[in-house]
């Protein structure tokens, strides 16, 4: 399924009681903390301070909330990565930029919980959207692998590209559970540490 064929996100014309994105951000946080199945529409309404029934002015169901946050995470991950690495032709700098971008998505952005849910709630993704999300997962893997292979070609990668890719994604996915924005490391500092694990010296 190509990007041009993606189903557009439908925006409700109903009067907004609270911003739509605020509801999604709250829902994503609850999905990450409690799990999608354990979170109720009432929980989400309570989190944003409105009656659960009012949520249906914005979303047809809890499943639609899940679909929209996953779609946004998947699309922005691919599009953002491509845009960031296009700023440099140097393989090492491109990898550093990619690492920083991935860290920002998973632990530094306002929608970081979208990405956490993308990882943790895959089993609950509706069948209709799975091919779309899988296309983006594959595309992001290709982007990452290409950057890794370019670094290897100039002798700057410590690991085989497939192993380096898994290390990177494993670190960023794991950071979701422990990284604190006001903790010991900033996103930039921790990104540099990850880069030092993957890039050869000299």
Regions found by a protein language model. Give the residues of each.
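N-terminal intrinsically disordered/low-complexity leader segments
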Residues: 1-18, 29
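Helix-turn-helix
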Residues: 22, 26, 30-64, 68
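Hydrophobic alpha-helical connector segments
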Residues: 68, 82-110, 165-168
């Amino acid at each position: 399924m190509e990007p041009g064929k993606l189903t557009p996100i439908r925006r409700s014309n109903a009067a907004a009681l609270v911003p739509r994105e605020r509801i999604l951000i709250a829902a994503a946080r609850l999905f990450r903390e409690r799990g999608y199945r354990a979170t109720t529409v009432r929980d989400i309404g309570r989190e944003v301070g409105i009656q659960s029934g009012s949520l249906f002015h914005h979303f047809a169901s809890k499943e639609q909330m899940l679909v929209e946050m996953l779609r946004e995470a998947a699309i922005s991950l691919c599009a953002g990565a491509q845009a960031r690495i296009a700023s440099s032709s140097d393989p090492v700098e491109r990898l550093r930029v990619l690492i920083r971008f991935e860290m920002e998505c998973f632990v530094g952005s306002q929608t970081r919980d979208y990405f956490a849910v993308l990882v943790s709630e895959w089993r609950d993704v509706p069948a209709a959207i799975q091919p779309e999300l899988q296309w983006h997962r594959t595309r992001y893997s290709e982007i990452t692998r290409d950057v890794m292979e370019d670094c290897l070609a100039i002798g700057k990668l410590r690991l085989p590209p497939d192993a380096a890719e898994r290390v990177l994604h494993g670190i960023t996915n794991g950071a979701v559970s422990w990284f604190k924005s006001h903790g010991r490391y900033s996103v930039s500092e921790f990104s540099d540490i990850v880069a030092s694990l993957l890039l050869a010296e000299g």
